[in-house]
């Protein structure tokens, strides 16, 4: 395709330089393996992004951020699959077997469609990463502020639709750039059968409308592709990375200040319920369960933001060199395109492929919820049951803390709950238990639903009933939302048949 007549030169480069020889050496070293590596990354990335789409669209995973990540995975899948067909055909078929059917009009149409589709999908993915950083910034800024903006699923759907639509509209000048030219096959292939010497070959070229008016359409599409699709999103990504890092620092400082203040609170709390005095002390209050503690919530915020920062950083690292090269290619003389851009084009293409493949690795390494959902979707139920049967395996989302509960029953003779010899009476119940972040289920149906095991795929180590006394019904006037642990506390009253050993056995069965 002819670019010289539509080129604008601001910087003139020398005709010869030792750097040109270095770039040529890099090209000669990497180009023979580029096609194989590209196909491998395309196949791997297509499978990985398909897994991302399946997992992130599950009902339990539908959040505004995950919906944007799903749209990014869809765009990356389109880019990788289109690039897979292009690389396979033109690297291993068209140039190797110079037959007219491999250079037909249909393949020329595919080449133009591949150029447009890859540009729109890849640019949409880049701008969606900017939208992702913006959504996370707004979410963190409005956290704890009742009057702040709350990002919902509907907002994420609108953001995805608007982003993709605007990218497609801005790419409209690029749609007018190309036409299909017919030329002899011997001008395309060097190793050609003499019988196909004058056979037609169809290739894309610059359209006449793009060259009209001093190449107005071509220049417009070129600068839109370089500035709007490369440089501008990279600048915004850099800004949001800085803002998110600043928010992380503020959150960390606030959490440390709150934890420091919480250390001055009394460690033991005593409450009264139904004539009983309950004393509860929590060990290790500085690091409680991940689902309910202050530090756990802060760590979840940090992990989510760090994961999104990793995604944005990968996008920034892979896109910034391409943006710089695209701008310089439009500003420098023809020597830049011949000796630098063309020789480094394969490496820039490799950066794009790596950026499209890294999301799955980031999710699996930094998101426990994604790993659990991926394990539940793609791992068979029998394997899950065998995994849960191991006593040393605990769900990573379970809260874990050591809680000491002491049941002190007032004594009619002396109100201190002790006998005359200074020891507690026989009716005094004291138990030290380990609370795991699950509540006692009233029947085995809840356990079956939680573990995914049923009569077809049973989990033998999981008990289907508990040997201790049944839980008492909720009395009238009590809060229906009272958890099962509260009923266990009530079972230590005078009319209860449960003993301290029964309570211990109850929690041991959990």
UniProtKB/Swiss-Prot annotation:
Glycans are attached at residue 186. One of its GO terms (biological process) is regulation of cellular response to heat. Gene3D superfamilies: Rhodopsin 7-helix transmembrane proteins (1.20.1070.10). Disulfide bonds: none annotated. Expressed in head neurons including the RID neuron and the paired AIY neurons, and in tail neurons including the paired PHA and PHB neurons. Not expressed in AVE and AVA neurons. Residues 487-499 have a biased composition (Polar residues). It is a multi-pass membrane protein. Residues 1-35, 86-107, 177-223, 329-343 are extracellular. Residues 57-64, 129-155, 245-307, 365-510 are cytoplasmic. Its main location: membrane. It is found in: Cell membrane. PROSITE patterns: G_PROTEIN_RECEP_F1_2. Pfam families: 7TM_GPCR_Srw. The keyword Cell membrane applies. GO terms for cellular component: neuronal cell body membrane; plasma membrane. InterPro entries: 7TM_GPCR_serpentine_rcpt_Srw (IPR019427), GPCR_1 (IPR053219), GPCR_Rhodpsn (IPR000276), GPCR_Rhodpsn_7TM (IPR017452). The chain crosses the membrane at residues 36-56, 65-85, 108-128, 156-176, 224-244, 308-328, 344-364. GO terms for molecular function: G protein-coupled peptide receptor activity; neuropeptide receptor activity. Residues 452-510 are annotated as: Disordered. Coiled coil: none annotated. Keywords: Cell membrane, G-protein coupled receptor, Glycoprotein, Membrane, Receptor, Transducer, Transmembrane, Transmembrane helix. PANTHER family: G-PROTEIN COUPLED RECEPTOR DMSR-1, MYOSUPPRESSIN RECEPTOR 1, ISOFORM B-RELATED. Belongs to the G-protein coupled receptor 1 family. G-protein coupled receptor. This is G-protein coupled receptor dmsr-1.
């Amino acid at each position: 395709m002819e670019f010289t007549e539509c080129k604008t030169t601001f910087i003139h480069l020398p005709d010869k330089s030792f750097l040109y020889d270095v770039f040529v050496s890099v090209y000669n070293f990497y180009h023979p393996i580029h096609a194989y590596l590209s196909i491998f990354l395309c196949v791997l990335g297509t499978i990985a992004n398909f897994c991302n789409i399946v997992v992130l669209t599950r009902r339990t995973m539908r959040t505004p951020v995950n919906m944007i990540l799903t749209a990014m995975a869809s765009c990356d899948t389109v880019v990788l699959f289109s690039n897979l067909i292009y690389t396979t055909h033109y690297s291993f078929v068209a140039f190797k077997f110079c037959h007219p059917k491999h250079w037909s009009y249909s393949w020329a149409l595919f080449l133009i469609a591949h150029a447009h589709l890859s540009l729109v999908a890849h640019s949409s993915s880049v701008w969606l990463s900017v939208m992702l950083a913006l959504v996370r910034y707004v979410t963190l800024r409005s956290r704890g502020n009742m009057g702040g903006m709350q990002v919902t699923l509907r907002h994420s759907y609108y953001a995805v639709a608007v982003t993709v639509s605007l990218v497609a509209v801005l790419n409209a000048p690029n749609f007018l750039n190309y036409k299909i030219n017919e030329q002899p096959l011997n001008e395309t292939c060097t190793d050609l059968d003499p019988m196909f010497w004058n056979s037609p070959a169809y290739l894309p070229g610059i359209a006449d409308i793009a060259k009209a008016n001093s190449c107005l359409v071509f220049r417009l599409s070129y600068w839109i592709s370089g500035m709007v699709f490369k440089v501008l999103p990279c600048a915004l990504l850099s800004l949001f990375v800085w803002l998110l890092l600043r928010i992380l620092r503020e959150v960390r400082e606030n959490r440390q200040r709150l934890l420091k203040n919480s250390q001055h609170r009394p460690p033991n709390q005593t409450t009264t319920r139904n004539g009983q005095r309950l004393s509860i002390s929590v060990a290790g209050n500085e690091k409680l369960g991940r689902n309910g503690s202050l530090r756990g919530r802060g760590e979840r915020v940090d992990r989510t933001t760090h994961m999104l920062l990793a995604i944005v950083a990968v996008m920034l690292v892979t896109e910034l060199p391409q943006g710089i090269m695209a701008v310089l290619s439009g500003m420098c003389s023809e020597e830049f395109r011949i000796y630098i851009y063309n020789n480094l084009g394969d490496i820039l293409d490799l950066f794009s492929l790596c950026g499209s493949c890294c999301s799955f690795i980031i999710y699996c390494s930094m998101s426990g919820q994604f790993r659990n959902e991926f394990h539940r979707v793609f791992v068979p139920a029998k394997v899950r049951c065998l995994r849960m049967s191991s006593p040393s395996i605990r769900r990573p989302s379970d809260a874990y803390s050591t809680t000491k509960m002491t049941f002190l029953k007032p004594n009619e003779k002396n109100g201190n709950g002790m006998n005359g010899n200074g020891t507690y009476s026989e009716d005094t119940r004291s138990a030290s238990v380990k609370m795991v972040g699950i509540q006692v289920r009233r029947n085995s149906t809840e356990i079956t639903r939680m573990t995914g095991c049923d009569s077809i795929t049973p989990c033998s180590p999981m008990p289907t009933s508990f040997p201790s006394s049944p839980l008492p019904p909720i009395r009238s006037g009590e809060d229906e939302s009272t958890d099962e642990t509260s009923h266990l506390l009530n079972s230590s009253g005078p009319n209860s048949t449960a003993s301290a050993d029964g309570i211990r056995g109850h929690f041991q069965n959990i």
